Amino acid sequence: MGSSRLPAKVLADIGGRPVLAHVLERAKLIDSDAILVLAIPSAASDDPLVEIGVAAGATIVRGSTDDVLDRYHQAARQTAADAVVRITGDCPLLDPAVSALVVDRFRTGDLDYASNVHPPTYPDGYDTEIISSAALAAAWREAVDPYEREHVTPFIWRRPDRFRSANVADAVDRSSWRLTLDTAEDLLQIRKLHHRLRQRGTFGLAEIVDLRQTIA
C-alpha cells in the first residue's frame, strides 16, 4: 500500500475489481496444487487487503513492513511449503503460463532458485521467482543488508557459487514493455488493455502481442 508514486495502487480499480484481486486470481492459476498466500504488512493501512485475500482463497500472513524476507520465510513455515513462488502485487496482467515455465524449470533442475529476471526478457510485470524453502531460510538467517531483507531474493542470486540458479528466457526480448503498475500512466494503459482483451478471459502474453501487432 505504501507506493510513493501511486499510493494504494493495489486497490485501484480495473474492470470493476481491485488490482490485487486480479493478481491473486492469476497467481492461483500458476499451479492448481499450490497454496495461495497473501503476505502483507501488519500495518493498519494494509487491513483492507485482508478481505480481498480471503475472498480469493488466500492464506493471510502478516509481518514487518520493511523486512519482506521475514514475511516470505514465515509464509513458507506456516504453510510447510518446500518452495515459494514470488509474485508482487503490482502485476495485474501477470501471465500464469509464463510463471508456470519458471516453476517447471525449478522443479526439473534440482535448483535453489529460478526466475525470468536474470536477465529479463519478458515484459516488466511478468516477473516470477521461485525459491526453495531451504534457501529462503538461509537468506532469512544470514542476510543483514537492508536491501536483501526488503527485496527477498538478492541474498540468493548474488551468491551463484552457493545457490543453484536458473533463468527462463523468451525467444523474443520484450523486457522494455511496461505491463506493471507503478504510475498513473501505467494504470491507464493497463485499464485500456484489460478493456480490449477481457472478453478472452485470463488473457496472457500471446493475446497482448497479437493486440499490439493489430494496432501497429
Indicate residue ranges for each PLM-predicted region.
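N-terminal glycine-rich phosphate-binding loop and ensuing alpha1 helix
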Residues: M1-I40
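Conserved donor nucleotide-binding strand/loop of the catalytic core
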Residues: V54-D67
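Short aromatic/hydrophobic "clamp" motif used to bind/position activated sugar donors
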Residues: V84-V85
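Conserved alpha/beta core of the MobA/IspD/sugar-nucleotide pyrophosphorylase nucleotidyltransferase superfamily
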Residues: I131, E150-A216
